[in-house]
Amino acid sequence: MAGFGAAPDFNEGSKINASKNQQDEGKMFIGGLSWDTSKKDLTEYLSRFGEVLDCTIKTDPVTGRSRGFGFVLFKDAVSVDKVLETNEHKLDGKLIDPKRAKALKGKEPPKKVFVGGLSPETTEEQIKQYFGGFGEIENIELPIDTKTNERRGFCFVTYTGEEPVKKLLESRFHQIGTGKCEIKAAQPKEVYRQQQQKQQRGGRGAVTGRGGTRGRGRGQGWNQGYNNYYDQNYGGYGNNGSYGDQDYNSYSGYDYSGYSYGYNPGYTEYSGQQSTYGKARGGGNHQNNYQPY
């Protein structure tokens, strides 16, 4: 067991993301966080209940501010029980609200990944060679810009099973050819559309124009705008939102849509709007009141 104050060695969120859409008894959702609470603060607090393998706090993709919730992965499921057995948790002057993280029922594990920031100099053979090292490839899609007739700065790789995807998602960035690419699980376009509709009802709408200018994509025309690929007819797939982390109405595989804390309006769905959760609470201990938990 990690002692209080110990910090686990991991790429933030990598282990949590690796098991999206799958039930993991060691995983927890942590709501009600102060906007000032850091990943280190949360890790140190929860380490008193058991060894923490991974921890991430979700932030607004535009402002970079904490959205007042996060996820933690314990090594042992018994640590989750210990957390839930404690009646009250207080961190940075706020009562926080830990819950078991439950995967969406009936959602199949992803077999397809989105590869963003792909240099046009990277050949199809290089792509096959790299991704083939993770498992058997069923298909590779290399979208072409219909206006320029040139390859776009992203691609899709579909595997015959879900295990290669889990391995890939353990790291967010991968060196492919001469460039550093970002890997995300691909989602069907209809799923993305539903998420965008919830975002717009929440008052923000879609966040656009960010994906193509992040990291190595900055200033490179071939890498501009691949955040919007879901609006093109490229196999009907999206990538969890506008190429960012604003999509948490179902947290890309965890059933938190309609998760109402009974505190403030604006935190009933994690669809990208700035959370008001953390500014005020309605009080009380709500250990068993939330669905779909």
UniProtKB/Swiss-Prot annotation:
Keyword Magnesium applies: no
A Pfam family matched in the record: RRM_1
Listed PROSITE patterns: RRM
CDD domains in the record: RRM1_hnRPDL
Region listing for Disordered, in residue ranges: 1-21, 193-224, 274-293
Bridged cysteine pairs (disulfide): none
InterPro entries per the UniProt record, alphabetical: hnRPDL_RRM1, Nucleotide-bd_a/b_plait_sf, RBD_domain_sf, RRM_dom
Keywords recorded for this protein, A-Z: Cytoplasm, DNA-binding, Methylation, Nucleus, Repeat, RNA-binding, Transcription, Transcription regulation
GO cellular component, one term: chromatin
GO terms (BP aspect): regulation of gene expression
SUPFAM superfamilies referenced in this protein's UniProt entry, alphabetically: RNA-binding domain, RBD
Domain RRM residue range list: 26-108, 111-188
Any GO molecular function: poly(G) binding
Highest taxon of source: Eukaryota
Localization per Swiss-Prot or TrEMBL: Nucleus; Cytoplasm
Function: Acts as a transcriptional regulator. Binds DNA and RNA.
PANTHER family: HETEROGENEOUS NUCLEAR RIBONUCLEOPROTEIN D-LIKE (PTHR48033:SF2), RNA-BINDING (RRM/RBD/RNP MOTIFS) FAMILY PROTEIN (PTHR48033)
Protein name listed in UniProt: Heterogeneous nuclear ribonucleoprotein D-like-A
Protein's gene: hnrnpdl-a
